[in-house]
C-alpha cells in the first residue's frame, strides 16, 4: 500500500452502479485506483476525475444501501488479485475472493488486473497445430498452439456446449493449467462446468473466475481481466496455459452499460465509443511470448445472428481462427453446427498443415459450395434436372455434411450416444475417401453422428 492509503473521501452522489466520491483536492486518486468502503468489502474503481477533488467510480458489487456521506478510503493501487498455484481448483469472483466456501486462498503473489500488453519483440508466433478431436474444427479451421480462437454463434446454436467439449478434449489431454473466465453467463452453466471438471479429476489444474449475468456491470466488465491476469502469470512462469472465456460479448455489453452510466455519448448501435480500444486492450494481452504461451478459446454471442454487428465484428480482427456456428445447420439437426464455408483459420496453408490436409479441406469446401449453388435449382426443378456430375456432387456434399456431425462427450446425457474423439489422421482419411468417391455406394444416413469413417461403414451394414 502506498502513502495515499490513508486518504479518505466521502460519497457525494450515487446513480446505480456509478458512485461519485469527493477527496481533498491535493490527494485525488489516480484512474483505476481501488477505493474501499469503510466497514464493508465493497470496492469501487476510479474511472474519471471530474475536478474539484471529485472522482467518478464504478461499483464492483451491489450498491444497495449506499448513501451520501459514507466514508471511502483510497488504497492507492489498482485492483490486485491472487495468482499462481493456490488459485487452481478454486472458484473466485472479480476481486479474486473465493466463492466456493473452501477457505481463503493462501497466495503470496498478487498482481494488478491492469497490465501492459507484451512488447512486439517479446511475442512468439506459433504454427504448431492443436488437435481438438472434433472433425469439423480439425479439418476446416484448425487451431494453433498459443493461438486465439473465437466461437461465434447466435442464441441457442451451441457455443457453450462446443466450448465444454473443447475443454473436455484439450484440457484433459493437455495436462497443463487452464483458466476459465465466466463473463456474464448463466450461473447454472458455471455450476455445471465446476462439477464436470470435478468429476473428470482435472479441477486441480483449473482456476475458475466468475462474474455471472446477475452481477453488476462493473463485475462483468472486469472479470475477464481478472481471469486473464491469472493466465498471464502462468505464462510468465514459462508454462503453456489454456484460457477460456464465455462470453466475450457480455464483456462488451458490460462496457456499454458502464459507458452509458459514465455519461459518454453512444456510438453505432448504442455501443460505447471506446469499443475498439477496450477490446484491443483485452485481446492484445491474450498472447504468447518467448517465455510461455496462452492458447485462448472465446465464445462470442452474435446478436440477432448478425455477424456485422459492431461487437462480433470488432472481435474478428484479433483472432487466428473463427468457428462460426450456423442456425441453418443446427436446424438440420447437424451438431456441432459449424458452418464449414464461413469458418476460417490462418493455419489453412499447405506450408503449415501439409499438402494433403490442405487439398482435402479445399475439396470438401468446393463440394459444399457447389451444393449450396445448386440448392435453388433443386428446390424449383428437382434433382432430375441436374447433370450426372452435379448429382454426384450433391450426393457427396450431403454425405460430407452429415459426416461433419459428431457425438460429444459432454452431450452424452442428452443424446444417449457415447462421445467420440477423432484423431486428425482419421479425419483426413475419412473425408479423402468421401471426396475420392470411395463411399458413393453408402447411404447418407450412415454418416450421421459417427466418429471415424470405419464407423460409417459399420452403420451402413446395419441399415442395409
Swiss-Prot record:
Q: Give the organism the record lists.
A: Burkholderia thailandensis (strain ATCC 700388 / DSM 13276 / CCUG 48851 / CIP 106301 / E264)
A single Pfam family it belongs to is ATP-synt_VA_C
Q: Where in the cell is it found?
A: Cell inner membrane
The Enzyme Commission number assigned here is 7.1.2.2
List the coiled-coil residues: none
Please state the gene responsible for encoding this protein. atpD1
* Family in the record: Belongs to the ATPase alpha/beta chains family.
Q: Enumerate the residues binding ATP.
A: 153-160
* Lineage of producing organism: Bacteria, Pseudomonadati, Pseudomonadota, Betaproteobacteria, Burkholderiales
Enzyme class comes to translocase
- Reaction(s) this enzyme catalyzes, per UniProt: ATP + H2O + 4 H(+)(in) = ADP + phosphate + 5 H(+)(out)
Name this protein carries in UniProt: ATP synthase subunit beta 1
Which InterPro entries does its entry note?
AAA+_ATPase, ATP-synt_VA_C, ATP_synth_F1_bsu, ATPase_a/bsu_AS, ATPase_alpha/beta_chains, ATPase_F1/V1/A1_a/bsu_N, ATPase_F1/V1/A1_a/bsu_N_sf, ATPase_F1/V1/A1_a/bsu_nucl-bd
Name the major location: membrane
Q: Which HAMAP family match?
A: ATP_synth_beta_bact
| Functional summary from the UniProt entry | Produces ATP from ADP in the presence of a proton gradient across the membrane. The catalytic sites are hosted primarily by the beta subunits.
According to the record's subunit comment, the protein's assembly and interactions are: F-type ATPases have 2 components, CF(1) - the catalytic core - and CF(0) - the membrane proton channel. CF(1) has five subunits: alpha(3), beta(3), gamma(1), delta(1), epsilon(1). CF(0) has three main subunits: a(1), b(2) and c(9-12). The alpha and beta chains form an alternating ring which encloses part of the gamma chain. CF(1) is attached to CF(0) by a central stalk formed by the gamma and epsilon chains, while a peripheral stalk is formed by the delta and b chains.
The record ties this protein, via CDD domains, to:
ATP-synt_F1_beta_C, ATP-synt_F1_beta_N, F1-ATPase_beta_CD
- What keywords would UniProt list here? ATP synthesis, ATP-binding, Cell inner membrane, Cell membrane, CF(1), Hydrogen ion transport, Ion transport, Membrane, Nucleotide-binding, Translocase, Transport
Amino acid at each position: 500500500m502506498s502513502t495515499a492509503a490513508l486518504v479518505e473521501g466521502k460519497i457525494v452522489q450515487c446513480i446505480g452502479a456509478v458512485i461519485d466520491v469527493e477527496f481533498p483536492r491535493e490527494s485525488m486518486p489516480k484512474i483505476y485506483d481501488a477505493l474501499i468502503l469503510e466497514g464493508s468489502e465493497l470496492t469501487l474503481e476510479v474511472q474519471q476525475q471530474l475536478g474539484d477533488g471529485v472522482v467518478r467510480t464504478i461499483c464492483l458489487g451491489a450498491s444497495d444501501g449506499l448513501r451520501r456521506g459514507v466514508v471511502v478510503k483510497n488504497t492507492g493501487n489498482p485492483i490486485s488479485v491472487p495468482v499462481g498455484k493456490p488459485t487452481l481448483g478454486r472458484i473466485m469472483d472479480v476481486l479474486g475472493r473465493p466463492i466456493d466456501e473452501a477457505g481463503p486462498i493462501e497466495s503470496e503473489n498478487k498482481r494488478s488486473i491492469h497490465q501492459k500488453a507484451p512488447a512486439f519483440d517479446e511475442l512468439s508466433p506459433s504454427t504448431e497445430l492443436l488437435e481438438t478431436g472434433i472433425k469439423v474444427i480439425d479439418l476446416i479451421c484448425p487451431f494453433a498452439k498459443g493461438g486465439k480462437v473465437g466461437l461465434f454463434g447466435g442464441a441457442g446454436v451451441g457455443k457453450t456446449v462446443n466450448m465444454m467439449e473443447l475443454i473436455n478434449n484439450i484440457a484433459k489431454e493437455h495436462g497443463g493449467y487452464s483458466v476459465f473466465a465466466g463473463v456474464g453467463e448463466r450461473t447454472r452453466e458455471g455450476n455445471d462446468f465446476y462439477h464436470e471438471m470435478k468429476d473428470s479429476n482435472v479441477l486441480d489444474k483449473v482456476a475458475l473466475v466468475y462474474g455471472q449475468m446477475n452481477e453488476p456491470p462493473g463485475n462483468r466488465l472486469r472479470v475477464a481481466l481478472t481471469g486473464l491476469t491469472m493466465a498471464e502469470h502462468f505464462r510468465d512462469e514459462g508454462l503453456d496455459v489454456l484460457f477460456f472465456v464465455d462470453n466475450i460479448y457480455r464483456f462488451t455489453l458490460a462496457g456499454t452499460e458502464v459507458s452509458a452510466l459514465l455519461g459518454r455519448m453512444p456510438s453505432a448501435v448504442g455501443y460505447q465509443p471506446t469499443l475498439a480500444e477496450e477490446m484491443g486492450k483485452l485481446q492484445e494481452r491474450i498472447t504468447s511470448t518467448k517465455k510461455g504461451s496462452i492458447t485462448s478459446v472465446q465464445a462470442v454471442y452474435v446478436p440477432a445472428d448478425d455477424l456485422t454487428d459492431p461487437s462480433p465484428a470488432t472481435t474478428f480482427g484479433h483472432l487466428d481462427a473463427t468457428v462460426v456456428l450456423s442456425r441453418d445447420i443446427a436446424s438440420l439437426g447437424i451438431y456441432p453446427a459449424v458452418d464449414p464455408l464461413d469458418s476460417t483459420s490462418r493455419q489453412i496453408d499447405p506450408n503449415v498443415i501439409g499438402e494433403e490436409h490442405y487439398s482435402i479441406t479445399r475439396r470438401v469446401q468446393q463440394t459444399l459450395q457447389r451444393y449450396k449453388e445448386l440448392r435453388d435449382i433443386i428446390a424449383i426443378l428437382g434433382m432430375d434436372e441436374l447433370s450426372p456430375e452435379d448429382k454426384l456432387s450433391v450426393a457427396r456434399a450431403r454425405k460430407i455434411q452429415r459426416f461433419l456431425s459428431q457425438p460429444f462427450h459432454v452431450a452424452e446425457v442428452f443424446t444417449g450416444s457415447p462421445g467420440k474423439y477423432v484423431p486428425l489422421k482419421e479425419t483426413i482419411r475419412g473425408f479423402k475417401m468421401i471426396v475420392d468417391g470411395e463411399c458413393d455406394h453408402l447411404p447418407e444416413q450412415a454418416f450421421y453422428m459417427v466418429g471415424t469413417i470405419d464407423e460409417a461403414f459399420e452403420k451402413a451394414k446395419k441399415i442395409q
